[in-house]
Swiss-Prot record:
It comes from Escherichia coli O6:K15:H31 (strain 536 / UPEC). Catalyzes the NADPH-dependent reduction of glyoxylate and hydroxypyruvate into glycolate and glycerate, respectively. The gene is ghrA. This is Glyoxylate/hydroxypyruvate reductase A. It comes from the Bacteria. Pfam families: 2-Hacid_dh_C.
Amino acid sequence: MDIIFYHPTFDTQWWIEALHKAIPQTRVRAWKSGDNESADYALVWHPPVEMLAGRDLKAVFALGAGVDSILSKLQAHPEMLKPSVPLFRLEDTGMGEQMQEYAVSQVLHWFRRFDDYRIQQNSSHWQPLPEYHREDFTIGILGAGVLGSKVAQSLQTWRFPLRCWSRTRKSWPGVQSFAGREELSAFLSQCRVLINLLPNTPETVGIINQQLLEKLPDGAYLLNLARGVHVVEDDLLAALDSGKVKGAMLDVFNREPLPPESPLWQHPRVTITPHVAAITRPAEAVDYISRTIAQVEKGERVCGQVDRARGY
């Protein structure tokens, strides 16, 4: 069995050695331009078109939870990957736990009004503030996939009212489910905190815009953990300046790295992290990939395959 590997920033040698240990009798090589030798599987992140074009692969694994970079290249270069080749993404591999940590810590930060106290501290102002109450602090999750379900589970521990919105209705215990565009307004109407975990598809690009933000309760908060293209940044800034949105925690942006001149950097109600909410944990990813390859080799049904038409 032959595996080709490409990632612009990962420690390639570590991955090659780890894959050798996890899948004995396998030959793993780092792909370089001009390498046209046969392979059975490809492990990739932002792969060049020439790496995959024309190959008879058993499967391709995206080394992250998102596959938008591959699918966007496929639109421009359909020859990049044959329709018969399954495309898999890393459904969890430690990302769910990281998303839980990130979301819970920020929700509690807002719920306990630490953002307000930080602003008071900046002006040396000592003033206890009225507390928020859980029943008035409904949390809405945009996107009800694997990571969305993990975040919902962790927030249930803190007894917040929870709701989710997705393409199809979910039946998560303790979570009110909304589905389809016709129910989006009703979903938004009670969301004190809006957590975005949507996939990146043509239908979701720019979804968090002026029209959506206006449907939130006054003084709502936004936590974007999905993709920067979901948010119209100028509309968010306007909502922050007007007070419609009280605070935003942003991990992803339309342009990354976020340009130094972006007004988001200096906005007092915005907190920024550099796309670190959930990173690929190599050891857990290798374990998932090795198990999945074994299932493919046996002809078993495998979870995590991307529906190219839907985009996730």
